[in-house]
Curated annotation (Swiss-Prot):
Function: Catalyzes a salvage reaction resulting in the formation of AMP, that is energically less costly than de novo synthesis.
Similarity section: Belongs to the purine/pyrimidine phosphoribosyltransferase family.
An annotated GO BP: AMP salvage
Pathway(s) served: Purine metabolism; AMP biosynthesis via salvage pathway; AMP from adenine: step 1/1
Keywords recorded for this protein, A-Z: Cytoplasm, Glycosyltransferase, Purine salvage, Transferase
CDD domains: PRTases_typeI
Protein name per the record: Adenine phosphoribosyltransferase
Gene source species: Streptococcus pneumoniae (strain Taiwan19F-14)
PANTHER family: ADENINE PHOSPHORIBOSYLTRANSFERASE (PTHR32315:SF3)
Gene3D superfamilies: 3.40.50.2020
Main localization of the protein described in the UniProt heading: cytoplasm
Alphabetical list of Pfam families matching this protein: Pribosyltran (PF00156)
Cellular component GO terms held in the UniProt record: cytoplasm
Catalyzed reaction equations: AMP + diphosphate = 5-phospho-alpha-D-ribose 1-diphosphate + adenine
Amino acid sequence: MNLKDYIATIENYPKEGITFRDISPLMADGNAYSYAVREIVQYATDKKIDMIVGPEARGFIVGCPVAFELGIGFAPVRKPGKLPREVIFADYEKEYGVDTLTMHADAIKPGQRVLIVDDLLATGGTVKATIEMIEKLGGVVAGCAFLVELDELNGREKIGDYDYKVLMHY
């Protein structure tokens, strides 16, 4: 299945000069959505994953069905003020400054093997901050999986030597 058939391209969104890759059509098609989830599940199977971690919001949309299919838990990564219990923080660089992500302080147990799942790898800031928090809690990042990678933004450089899978490259 060619998943790119289910990605909408919107020019100059959210601002002039940006090409936005919208995964909504993929999610709206049951066969394409299931196929994408199964591809990530297959990638995860050999890695003996204990937990899926997904950044808000689209990491939830992709990561939760992967966790469900694997029969394991899911831990959300959110912006500050969105998680109700004790959290840890990690800052990351964005195009116009610094932002912060949080994760529950008890989300990952030491030694747990974690797969980070998100919709898009762009600059890599989000995944780098997520890796930092998982490792701070003693987790082992076994890999990362993305529906889409925007190759020209070089997000792969922020992942370093961690294994990763991408279903579509732009």
